[in-house]
UniProtKB/Swiss-Prot annotation:
Lineage: Eukaryota, Metazoa, Chordata, Craniata, Vertebrata
Name of the featured protein: E3 ubiquitin-protein ligase RNF8
Species name: Mus musculus (Mouse)
Start and end residues, zinc fingers (RING-type): 406-444
Family in the record: Belongs to the RNF8 family.
Gene Ontology cellular component terms for the protein in this record: chromosome, telomeric region; cytoplasm; cytosol; midbody; nucleoplasm; nucleus; site of double-strand break; ubiquitin ligase complex
Domain comment in the entry: The FHA domain specifically recognizes and binds ATM-phosphorylated MDC1 and phosphorylated HERC2. This domain is also required for proper recruitment to DNA damage sites after UV irradiation, ionizing radiation, or treatment with an alkylating agent.
Record-listed E.C. numbers: 2.3.2.27
Amino acid sequence: MGEPDPLVSGQLAARRSWCLRRLGMDCEWLQLEAGTEVTIGRGLSVTYQLISKVCPLMISRSHCVLKQNPEGQWTIMDNKSLNGVWLNRERLAPLQGYCIRKGDHIQLGVPLESRETAEYEYEVIEEDWESLAPCLAPKNDQRMEKHKGSRTKRKFSSPGLENLPAEGSSDLRCPLANVASKPIEPEKLHGKGDASSQSLGCLCPGLTSLKASERAAGPHACSALPKVLELSCPKKQKACRPSASQNSLELFKVTMSRMLKLKTQMQEKQIAVLNVKRQTRKGSSKKIVRMEKELRNLQSQLYAEQAQQQARVEQLEKTFQEEAHYLQGLEKEQGECDLKQQLVQALQEHQALMEELNCSKKDFEKIIQAKNKELEQTKEEKDKVQAQKEEVLSHMNDLLENELQCIICSEYFIEAVTLNCAHSFCSFCINEWMKRKVECPICRKDIESRTNSLVLDNCISKMVDNLSSDVKERRSVLIRERRAKRLS
């Protein structure tokens, strides 16, 4: 942890300061300095850079922004992050400021399936500067200045290899988190594959083939490394031919960029699964069908990527062997040592990338298990809702048939009329009955009065709206027929 700037310490020593205390840790606290805007993310231009050790893409490049409003109160805003910002267990809407108070709980990202809590959880506190200073995390500009000047620029004298370090080894060396924050562009690698045109949903049993391809590629690449090291004796080149391994490296990089972009899409699918879980009661079967279709599409795409990756590794090994034999036959030509160092470095970087992929397999498996589990829960909830709906409709039908039918026409009441004896009939039906007898068809009492029941009509109309289209159509036909007879 870096020490705070002495000038800032002098200015803040005499007063209290707001801070985000990381739960469960006595370090990496984030100071909220008055009058400044604090940005948090995994990018390079933020105030505090957070690199997740569990899931590199959990924190977005510019995840959230904290600043003071005109009244001087601190607010937090979700800067359209992928995995969200949570204030007191409630997810914040993007690009909207929310006031925070002392004791509030702030969570960045979501917990993985195997964990109960997220990796980055904080509590809003206000303490004296002296007690906060030892626990504060260094700002990103302090960390960058500490590492400034440690980078060296490599130079190559061979014209055929001038572009290889910039396009090959440096990109291959990037860890998964850095590649995800700045994706490799295939057009810059002179590759013919279009990785960005594929819409990836999620990973499924394709991880088995990923493991097999890594086991096959790793030993081959490592076995070629000692052979190249044996040729590293200092010789001078008089002429240089274009490296035959350059094309293979470029093709390999294109495939690796696709694999890394696949992980980015996996993080998006994890959030989609969480959203589906929250919207289960409002969801429809279309979401489930779409998710299953994406699973199948991604599985086929992943198998194709695995096959291409294995082919690239085999071609790369073959090319390296050819380069080794070529170097053995070269006499004292200028730049031979640079070429061999380049080949060794490329192999080492390839091996490091394979190790990174091997470490990230567990994250892929956790995400797949979480998605499958959420999909099953969504199906179960949908079945329960459908069963409840059918039960309500069945109960409604029984109620209509038993209580709300006219005894004369055996249909649901149309313009219900209640007699003095409390029995109800259709207005049309009782009028026709009274042409023959002026007594109740049920109890045989004389009809002295009749009252229209508007409440009963409205109740029947609303209940019929939830029934089948055949019942609604039949009722509409009866209403039209009776109105026509009444007018005639």
